[in-house]
Regions:
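Alpha-helical structural context detector biased toward long hydrophobic helices
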Residues: 1-259
């Protein structure tokens, strides 16, 4: 049976970007290929029928999406003031790092590299290749894991009137004090933040109160998506995507490699 699978960005994150003012609670998204701004259900956006097998779907649910869903729910409640404090446990941090690694593995860039270098890819079905890349990729150890081991997990809180957007790629890199940080938006007002251990925030939160910083972060979101997939950037606000749409002609050619 072919399942309608989220290729990369899981529904447990995407649903947090629904437009709550919309009676249908759909997600706004910018198609970075066409520049069109459209709406779609979070259950359908970024999906492909038969992309993963039932076994592949269970693998992602057990290893990534179920633990991530619990963490993102807590982050969202903290951002909206529904809970007074937020603690990131060692298990939470491990789950967040697995999410980032999984995003690398599930990108179009990773799939293209596998198809280019694998001696068996051409003899297997696309679905089998996707499943194998998921299983072996998540269990492998290489430069991605080495870099993630040197980072601590914090939470970024958006205290501005602007909204964070999220790429299909799940995360993006930003540079602070000449050091790369990983940002993975999980709701319009919050993101998972990975930074070098020596720069980690006391109390495990970093607060952004300048709307210009959020605008810059959203541009990095667009750049990351252009680099890894060239698919879409999603938001709960059409306004944020209208602003990014004006950046598209500039960023198509100027976004340099961020990997």
């Amino acid at each position: 049976m072919n399942i309608n699978s989220h290729v990369q960005l899981p529904n447990c994150v995407l649903r947090n970007f629904r437009d709550e003012t919309d009676p249908e609670k759909k997600v706004w998204y910018l198609d970075v290929q066409t520049g069109d701004i459209l709406r779609k259900s979070s259950k359908k956006l970024g999906t492909c029928k038969g992309y993963y097998s039932e076994t592949g779907e269970r693998f992602w649910a057990e290893n990534i999406e179920n633990p991530l869903s619990i963490i993102t729910h807590r982050i969202q409640k903290y951002c909206t003031g529904e809970i007074p404090c937020l603690q990131i446990s060692a298990d939470d941090a491990d789950a967040c790092k697995r999410y980032i690694k999984a995003a690398f593995i599930r990108s179009k860039m990773a799939e293209d590299e596998m198809n280019k270098h694998s001696v068996t890819a051409s003899t297997c079905t696309e679905q089998s290749n996707h499943d194998m890349l998921a299983c072996f990729g998540l269990r492998s150890y290489g430069p991605i894991e080495s870099n993630l081991e040197k980072m601590d997990v914090s939470v970024l809180i958006n205290k501005t009137e602007r909204m964070l957007v999220v790429p299909r790629n799940c995360f993006y890199l930003v540079t602070s004090q000449d050091v790369p940080h990983i940002v993975a938006p999980v709701c319009p007002k919050g993101a998972i933040l990975l930074m070098p251990r020596e720069m980690a925030c006391a109390g495990m939160t970093a607060v952004v109160s300048d709307p210009n910083v959020i605008e810059e972060m959203n541009i990095w979101t667009l750049c990351s998506e252009l680099e890894f997939n060239s698919a879409f950037v999603a938001a709960n606000s059409r306004t944020e995507l209208e602003l990014l749409k004006y950046e598209l002609p500039l960023r198509h050619d100027t976004c340099s490699s961020i990997v």
